Amino acid sequence: MIRTDKEKFLEKIKENIDIENLKGDGKIFSYVNRDYLAGDNKKYMNMYDKLSFWYDFGEKWIGLFRYGNTISEMRKNLMKHLEWRNGISVLYVSIGTGKDLNFIPQNVDLKSLDFTGIDISYGMLKKCHSVWKKRTNLTLVNCCAEDLPFKDNVFDIVFHVGGINFFTDKALAIKEMIRVSKPGSKI
């Protein structure tokens, strides 16, 4: 029996979560624990929701003028350190618009990956979906990094680029990333 991407995704959800409560609009699931929607999480969620339409354009030009090509080089180097291979299960925490997916090694077939991206900003996820929907099998979830809706030990790769500075509880977010990673995975 062949499982759909949605079925594969739902198999990863913690058992104490009512699947019916994973609201979604058909493109993006939602699991926002209101307990974590305070402090920096709330502030930056609102900011990134407002910036989402222009984010990639602004990052490209401001980043280029301010940092040269170093941001792209950093992303490319980061992706080299992860153990990419076709067919694995991947979680990208704070996926934003998905720009970093451009730096996954070219020998990896993006459509072969069981790929999940989470972000606290629904606006950024909408932008990510519009850019990546035809190029990947990407499931997007609007949730806080401090309360991931996934079972323990389900992802071969869990990665995050830069947004941790904006989390309300950085230590808890890191613990969550470790919890959902398979033993021996690089984070």
Question: Residue locations for each model-derived region?
Answer:
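Short N-terminal helix/helix-N-cap motif within the alpha/beta-hydrolase-1
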Residues: 123, 168-171
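A short acidic, Gly/Pro-enriched loop at the edge of an enzyme's catalytic core
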Residues: 146-157
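N-terminal accessory segments
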Residues: 1-33
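Conserved class I S-adenosyl-L-methionine
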Residues: 24-84, 99-103, 124-127, 131
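A short glycine-rich, Lys/Arg-flanked "PGG" loop and its adjoining helix->strand segment in the class I
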Residues: 171-183
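A short SAM/SAH-binding and catalytic strip from SAM-dependent methyltransferases
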Residues: 157-169
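Class I SAM-dependent methyltransferase SAM/SAH-binding core
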Residues: 89-147
